[in-house]
Amino acid sequence: MSTNFKQALAKNKIVAAVKHSEDLAEVLPIPWITVVFLLGSDINGLEQAIKLAGNYPGKHVLAHLDLMEGIGKDQAGIRYLKKLGLKGVVSVKWQLLHYARDLGLFTVQRLFLVDSEAIKTGLEIIKKVTPDAIEIMPATVPRFAIEEFRKVTNLTILGGGLLRTEEDVKGALANGLMGVTASRRNLWHLHLP
């Protein structure tokens, strides 16, 4: 899925981040949205969300493990998600991503870069787990922070958080991000190939 993920981002730099599984019905029909992060749901809504996503070939839906309710945050929980048909996961917990990678799921390591120490820790984490992609929070971090990651990896680097306008998105991309995750509906409708 790593190559498919990069190809999907090449079609549009916006990754829709939906807070409720019900929002998938709104975002999946948008033709240029090819990647969706499900940030909030529970075990009851997830199975239906995965089935709905299956109606949209070429769309990639990943669930944020840390924000899912009713799923064990352990190997058994991740095995269950794979059994449901989930293709990928997002987490701040590198150990969970390690399990997910071992099961063949696409993995995105979310990193909060609040200071230089967080950058150093983030660099150590990606060496441990080698995720398929990185999501840096907030997307408005300075260019040098993104460049620190570019020096040591060729992973897809996304940014998320603190994006409200098209100008915010374009500024984040100009700083070196390959794409951005956006929970604001107005940003889902931006087509930025």
Q: How does the language model describe each region?
A:
Residues 1-62, 69-71, 82-85:
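Conserved N-terminal beta1-alpha1 strand-loop-helix module at the mouth
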Residues 36-40, 95-96, 138-141, 161-193:
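Glycine-rich phosphate-binding active-site loops on the catalytic face of alpha/beta enzymes
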Residues 47-67, 75-76, 83-84, 99-110, ...:
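Alpha-helix-loop-beta-strand connector modules within alpha/beta enzyme cores
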Residues 30-36, 58, 83-87, 102-108, ...:
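Glycine-enriched alpha-helix->loop->beta-strand junction motifs that scaffold or abut catalytic
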Residues 47-60, 66-84, 126-133, 169-186:
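Ligand-binding grooves and catalytic loops that recognize ribose/phosphate and carbohydrate rings
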Residues 45, 70-71, 98, 117, ...:
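Generic structural signal for helix capping and beta-alpha/helix-loop junctions
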Residues 15-19, 34-43, 62-68, 84-95, ...:
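Catalytic beta/alpha-barrel core
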Residues 24-29, 73-81, 121-126, 144-159, ...:
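Catalytic cores of alpha/beta
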